[in-house]
Swiss-Prot record:
Superkingdom: Eukaryota
Entry keyword annotation includes Plastid: yes
Enzyme Commission code(s) on record: 7.1.1.-
Record protein name field: NAD(P)H-quinone oxidoreductase subunit 3, chloroplastic
Membrane protein topology class: Multi-pass membrane protein
Keywords: Chloroplast, Membrane, NAD, NADP, Plastid, Plastoquinone, Quinone, Thylakoid, Translocase, Transmembrane, Transmembrane helix, Transport
Tagged with keyword Kinase: no
A GO MF term: NADH dehydrogenase (ubiquinone) activity
Main localization of the protein described in the UniProt heading: plastid
Natural source organism: Arabis hirsuta (Hairy rock-cress)
Gene3D superfamilies tied to this protein: NADH:ubiquinone/plastoquinone oxidoreductase, chain 3
GO BP field: photosynthesis, light reaction
Subcellular location(s) per record: Plastid, Chloroplast thylakoid membrane
Length: 120
């Protein structure tokens, strides 16, 4: 039996949430004035006339810190819902999260030993 009618609210939400941004872009594209000129083609830096080249090279250390930050930021995103429903999930979920955190700690120790977290 085809039970698509049970998901009517989901499909309505999906269609409306997809249509709103598309309509916003279309309306702004139709109603906005189009003025081309040298001011539109220049870069904007907080109201200050840009000086020098906009491209600079960052040291690889910044990327290593950013990667470690992203890993532990994602860990927080995964741990928060678990912590909110800890009393419902039971011991098996606790063991799974413990293994998850243990793997992340091993990754942190590995990065630390490789010197990825030292600023030199």
């Amino acid at each position: 039996m085809f039970l698509l009618y049970e998901y009517d609210i989901f499909w309505a939400f999906l269609i409306i949430s997809s249509a709103i941004p598309v309509l916003a872009f279309l309306i702004s594209g139709v109603l906005s004035p189009i003025r081309k000129g040298p001011e539109k083609l220049s870069s904007y830096e907080s109201g200050i006339e840009p000086i020098g080249d906009a491209w600079l090279q960052f040291r690889i250390r910044y990327y290593m810190f950013a990667l470690v930050f992203v890993v532990f930021d994602v860990e927080t995103v995964f741990l928060y819902p678990w912590a909110m429903s800890f009393d419902v999930l039971g011991v098996s979920a606790f063991i799974e999260v413990f293994i998850f955190v243990l793997i992340l700690i091993l990754g942190l120790v590995y990065a630390w030993r490789k010197g990825a977290l030292e600023w030199s």
